[in-house]
C-alpha cells in the first residue's frame, strides 16, 4: 500500500510540475546526485528553487558517493533511471516505481558514468579503474562484465543515436566506440579511431548532449567548458553565452531545447567535489541564477530527459 501511495504522489508531482509552467511549456527538470544523503533526486527548477515543494522524485542508494545518473527509455522496462555509486556499484531502476531491474557490483574502481545502449548493453566508465566495462541486462542482479576497453581516467560515456557510437572521455581524450550484442549474448566493442581526438585541456570530467544542436556535445575539464562540434571536430570555447560558463571545475552540465543551461561546481563544504548550488542560465544567455539547496550536497546534475540527443 505504501508503494502505491508513493507512486501516486510521484505522478501527481510530475503533473503539477508540467501544469505550473503553463499550457504547452515544458518544465525545467533536473536529476541530481545528493551525496550527503546517498539519494538520487529529481527537481523542477522552473521557479528557481530546490526544496520539498519542487522535489518530483527521489531514490535511496545502498552506497555513498553517487557519481552519475541518466534517464532513459528501455524497450523492455519502460522509463528507467541509471546510476553508479560506491566503489563498484551500478544499477538501473524503473521510473517512477523505483524497482531494481538490473544491477552490478562489478564495475571497475570508482565508477563515474553509466549509459544504456539501445541494443540492451550498459556501459560504465570508471576513473580509478581506467576502464569502460560493458554489461548485458539479462541478469537482474550481480551482472558480470561481458567486455571492456581501457581509457585512462575514464569519466564520461554518452550514446549517439545519429552516429551509432558510444562517446567517451577520459584524461585529455575524447573517443568513440561501436557496440554490438549478437544473438548469443556476446558483446563486441570497437574503437572508432577516426573519432579519437585530444581535448585541449586536461582532466576531462563531464560529457553531455546539447539538446538544441545534435551536432554538438558538452565537455567539461578541470579548467574549461567546451562545446565540441562533431562535424568539424572543433572544441569551441567562445560559443554564445560562454561568459556565464567561464569557470573551472564544472562537475556536471546540460542544456534544454531552448538553450537554457544548468551546471554545478564544488563549494567544498561537504566534499572537495560537491556543492549545494545548481546554476541555471535561462536560454543560455546572461548571468546564471544560483539555486541553492539546504538539504543536500551534490556532485552531478543532469537534464532529466530520456533522449540521448
Where are these regions (language model features)?
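Aromatic (tryptophan-biased) beta-strands that constitute blades/sheets of beta-rich domains
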Residues: 48-67, 99-107, 143-147, 191-197, ...
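Blade-loop segments of beta-propeller domains
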Residues: 53-91, 95-115
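Repeated scaffold domains used in trafficking and secretory/extracellular systems
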Residues: 63-74, 108-117, 151-159, 199-212, ...
Amino acid at each position: 500500500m505504501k508503494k502505491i501511495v508513493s507512486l501516486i504522489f510521484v505522478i501527481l508531482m510530475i503533473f503539477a510540475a508540467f501544469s505550473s509552467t503553463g499550457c504547452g511549456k515544458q518544465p525545467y527538470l533536473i536529476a541530481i546526485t545528493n551525496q550527503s544523503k546517498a539519494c538520487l533526486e529529481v527537481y523542477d527548477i522552473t521557479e528557481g528553487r530546490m526544496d520539498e515543494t519542487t522535489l518530483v522524485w527521489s531514490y535511496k542508494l545502498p552506497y555513498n558517493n553517487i557519481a552519475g545518473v541518466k534517464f532513459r527509455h528501455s524497450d523492455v522496462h519502460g522509463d528507467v533511471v541509471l546510476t553508479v555509486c560506491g566503489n563498484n556499484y551500478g544499477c538501473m531502476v524503473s521510473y517512477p516505481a523505483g524497482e531494481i531491474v538490473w544491477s552490478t557490483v562489478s564495475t571497475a574502481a570508482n565508477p563515474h558514468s553509466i549509459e544504456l545502449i539501445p541494443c540492451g548493453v550498459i556501459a560504465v566508465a570508471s576513473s580509478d579503474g581506467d576502464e569502460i566495462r560493458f554489461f548485458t541486462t539479462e541478469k537482474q542482479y550481480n551482472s558480470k562484465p561481458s567486455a571492456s576497453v581501457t581509457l585512462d581516467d575514464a569519466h564520461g560515456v554518452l550514446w549517439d543515436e545519429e552516429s551509432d557510437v558510444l562517446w567517451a572521455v577520459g584524461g585529455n581524450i575524447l573517443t568513440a566506440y561501436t557496440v554490438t550484442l549478437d544473438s548469443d549474448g556476446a558483446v563486441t566493442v570497437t574503437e572508432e579511431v577516426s573519432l579519437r581526438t585530444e581535448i585541449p585541456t586536461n582532466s576531462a570530467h563531464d560529457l553531455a548532449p546539447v539538446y538544441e544542436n545534435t551536432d554538438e556535445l558538452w565537455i567539461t575539464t578541470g579548467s574549461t567548458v567546451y562545446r565540441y562540434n562533431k562535424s568539424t571536430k572543433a572544441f569551441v570555447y567562445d560559443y554564445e553565452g560562454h561568459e556565464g560558463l567561464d569557470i573551472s571545475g564544472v562537475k556536471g552540465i546540460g542544456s534544454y531545447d531552448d538553450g537554457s543551461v544548468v551546471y554545478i561546481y564544488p563549494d567544498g563544504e561537504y566534499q572537495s567535489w560537491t556543492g549545494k548550488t545548481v546554476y541555471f542560465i535561462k536560454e543560455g544567455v546572461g548571468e546564471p541564477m544560483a539555486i541553492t539547496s539546504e538539504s543536500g550536497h551534490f556532485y552531478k546534475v543532469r537534464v532529466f530527459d530520456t533522449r540521448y540527443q
